Amino acid sequence: MASSLTCTGVIWALLSFLSAATSCVGFFMPYWLWGSQLGKPVSFGTFRRCSYPVHDESRQMMVMVEECGRYASFQGIPSTEWRICTIVTGLGCGLLLLVALTALMGCCVSELISRTVGRVAGGIQFLGGLLIGAGCALYPLGWDSEEVRQTCGYISDQFDLGKCEIGWAYYCTGAGAAAAMLLCTWLACFSGKKQKHYPY
C-alpha cells in the first residue's frame, strides 16, 4: 500500500489520532467536576451530568437519581460560560478529529498529504488545540451556577471549587489539546513527502 507520509508523518498520524481521541473522550464524559449532593456522588461535564435531584411525590422529599445524561436542552446547561465552553471545545475536538482521520488516510493513500497539506493540517491542529484550551479555561467561570453550588457545599465560586474536585475527563481533554498544539503541530511540518512532478 502506498503512503503519502514520511516516517515522521506516520508518527504524526498516530499521535494525531491519540490526541484527538483523548480530547474527544474527555469532552464527552461527564467527569470534569466531582462533588456530592444528598450523600450521593455527583459529576458534571460541559453538557452532561451524573446524578441529579428530583422531588419524590410519594415521600414528599428530594431524592437523587443516580444516572448520567445530557441536559434536556442547550438552555438547560447551568451557565452561559458552560454553553460557550461546550461549543468551543466541541469545535476544537471536531477539528482535531478531522485532521487525525485525514492523517490516518494518508498512511494508505499516496499523494494525499504533501508538505503544504501537512503544514496546513498542523495549523488546523493548533487552532483545534487552542479552542479546546479556551474551553478548558472558560469552564471554571461556571462554578458559581446554582447546580454546582448545591453540589460543592454552597461555597463554590468562579475559579473556586468549594468542596468539589476537578475530574479526570477535564485533564484528559486538556492533555489531548496540549499534545495536538505542541507535538502534533510540530510533527505535521515534516509529515508529507515532496510531491512528484509529472511531465504531462
Curated annotation (Swiss-Prot):
Keywords, alphabetical: Membrane, Signal, Transmembrane, Transmembrane helix
Localization per Swiss-Prot or TrEMBL: Membrane
Span of the signal peptide: 1-23
Transmembrane segments: 84-104, 123-143, 166-186
Any Pfam family hit: L_HMGIC_fpl
GO CC terms: membrane
Presence of the UniProt keyword Transmembrane in the record: yes
Membrane topology: Multi-pass membrane protein
Keyword NADP on entry: no
InterPro entries hit by this protein: LHFPL (IPR019372)
Family classification: Belongs to the LHFP family.
UniProt-listed PANTHER family: LHFPL TETRASPAN SUBFAMILY MEMBER 6 PROTEIN (PTHR12489:SF12), LIPOMA HMGIC FUSION PARTNER-LIKE PROTEIN (PTHR12489)
Record's protein name: LHFPL tetraspan subfamily member 6 protein
Lineage: Eukaryota, Metazoa, Chordata, Craniata, Vertebrata
